[in-house]
Amino acid sequence: MNDGLYHSMTPTTRLAPGEQVLHAFNPDKGAYWRDHAWIAAVAMAAGMVILWAIGNPHVWTGAVGGLAAVAVRAFYVASDEMQARWDLTDRRLLGPQTRAVHLGEIATIRTLGSAVQVVTRSGDKHLLKYQPDRDATRQRIESAMSGAF
């Protein structure tokens, strides 16, 4: 397999004859850091609660550990996550590498934080992460599904 295609964070699936890209969904740095701030807050609180529950007198170290863990992850994967792109065509939703979902196969579209989850009729789940406006992303996909784009 071509290693460049396998590790690509943009769609590598070829367009069908006559198929047109209607919109490209790119991640947003502000949404990325905002989501990680929320994750860090939860990790800090969880770390403190766990240490308190086991009777550790240094509960504050749970906050430090939670923050450090999320911060390391956030900085480590930021460059990859900011390159991920999804393309919406008049027929399909094309994701990083060779991910492709026919619009007619989409069963459910959900939102969580800044992400939009697309669930197919066969149960496959795809996540468009760190969207600047998750509701607009959802609306664009729904409009393309109904042919009203």
Per-range role (PLM):
Residues 1-52:
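N-terminal membrane-targeting/pre-transmembrane regions
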Residues 2, 19-20, 26, 121-149:
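A membrane-cytosol interface segment of integral membrane proteins
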Residues 14-18, 81, 121:
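A generic structural signal for short, non-catalytic loop/turn and secondary-structure boundary residues
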Residues 21-24, 87, 117:
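Soluble periplasmic/extracytoplasmic beta-strand elements of cell-envelope proteins
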Residues 30-82:
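Alpha-helical transmembrane spans
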Residues 55-57, 63-71, 115, 130-143:
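A general structural signal for short secondary-structure boundary/capping elements
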Residues 67-108:
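Conserved beta-hairpin
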Residues 96-136:
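Acidic, Ser/Thr-rich low-complexity segments on the non-lumenal side of membrane proteins
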